[in-house]
Amino acid sequence: MDENQPVAEMPTDLFAVRPDTKGPKTVGVLLLFGAFLLFFQAYGDIGLHNATDLDDEEVGLILDVPNSQGDGNNDISTEQYQTFHDAARESGGYALRGYGLLIASLLLFVGGGMLIFLNGFGAKIALSGASIGLITGIAGSLMVKSAADTHLQGVLLLTYEITTYLCGICMAMCAGIAALPLINTRARLALYPENKVYLANEEE
């Protein structure tokens, strides 16, 4: 081998981690979809908080299924449900969950949009929104469930208990999805390209 022959240099980025631009964009789209769902849930809760008297026909539709599943001894009347509704409003459960999810949906919308454009700050905004939704959603659902435990009976009690669990699970999933671009190395590199690492060659 010719000693004067130049030695081929190893590319500095041969073993570098490649950025993944598709992952953060996919997460952004999922967060936008979740933001729309949260917005409609928040809109419904805020509407319930502002509704002093429920329509008898609407209450009848709500009670039709649970009352039909019992033997008639534990049927819930329209007046009982209205009493529960008033207690849930006075507890602040509807308001806490509604306005909390509204803030969460706005932050998820902004954060998801920023992730689509590969802005790393969007993941942090979305994660904070999901955390707010998780806390306020569970707390508000527990307040509503407490009112249900006091004034309702039968199948509806299970319904409001399941709602609490579902709210917590959905918001925990949103938080997990929002955190993915911050945890995954390739996704984080796409969001923060200035942190790219190169392999250094030292000549002997």
Regions found by a protein language model. Name each.
Residues 2-204:
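Topology signature of small-to-medium multi-pass alpha-helical membrane proteins
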